[in-house]
């Protein structure tokens, strides 16, 4: 059963894949998987009532086994939107990672200083602000700025997740953030557009003009239109994403 706790997996959501291949590339010593999630299990860490999707369960033990199989030494476990601001599943993974994981949380403005400190003690080092409309409900920007100012003294960073088409609207907010800023998935570029076109040029300017902004080069499987080798025998894989990376 892919999802426990009386939850039903959203139609079309992938099941857990039990047979991943081992990479031919040997990762360097200290390699970190900079973006991964744990989902539930639903019978232990229920999914949020306001979630936009229900995934298959993907526990911390499955994550750690995959980490070792792929050759990573550490993980950055990012709070999944299906858990809302209930960070228990993510924190549980950090506490059982034997010092090999850090976390990125989702919090609301009413979180206490004590609870922020407890997240820090567990290994959380950032918060995620999600602007992908199909995944989350709107949060007022003044609330997010308040959160950013509260986590700054802890030395945390802010992770931002957005669609490339929304960058012009979000520019002033992003550039006002007082912390280090980490962009998820290269700002989700539309890879059917020219890499030297105006949309990606704006993202490049966002990066170059703001030294506190960094980007994760991640998630080609969500960005690609052409698909990986397994889908169309393209060599190398993700040929439409590579120019943007």
Name every feature range the model reports, one short phrase each.
Residues 1-3:
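N-terminal export leaders
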Residues 6-154:
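Mid-domain alpha/beta scaffold segments of enzyme catalytic cores
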Residues 7-21, 191-245:
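H/E-rich (His + Asp/Glu) clusters that bind or coordinate divalent metals
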Residues 54-55, 78-81, 161, 229, ...:
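Short, surface-exposed alpha-helical recognition segments that flank or form part
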Residues 57, 108-110, 117-118, 122-206, ...:
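Divalent metal-binding pocket/active-site signature
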Residues 60-63, 87, 112, 144, ...:
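Aromatic/hydrophobic pocket-lining residues that form the small-molecule binding cavity
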Residues 67, 94, 98, 174, ...:
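N-terminal cationic-hydrophobic initiation segments that often serve targeting/anchoring roles
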Residues 76, 102-104, 159, 182, ...:
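Structural detector of well-ordered beta-strand residues that form the stable sheet scaffold
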